[in-house]
Amino acid sequence: MNIISNSCIGGFLMRDYLKEKFNNPFIWSYIDNISFFNLIKNYENINWLNFELIKDKNWNFCILVDNLVKINYPHYHFDPNANKITFFDDDNQHRNVYYNKIWEYIVEKYKTRTERMLKINVKPIFILASCYDG
């Protein structure tokens, strides 16, 4: 199954209810409205290997896929003191990740999950769970 949501709900569904491996790069992310529309409209034609990691001066970051879809990862945090990957589950059962190489970790997860998504080659079920301005 390939569930793609514009919020963290996809991660909860895959982890807590379906008990499946995360098989797309949209797990624990949010996607703004324009990017989500672009994703739905262009899903079959997106070049998933054409992506870039974008960072700002406030340690925020996202992955821009094929200049169409911006994936934001609010649960992944840069921590200069975290020499190894540290997980922390907050009160809302979000799994937050802290690491001093968080950007490399995000890119690795993006590549691994994208590869898995392309390999299973299953049409996605899109879930619009929230509206995000972008």
Residue positions per predicted region:
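Extracellular glycan-modifying ectodomains
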Residues: 1-134
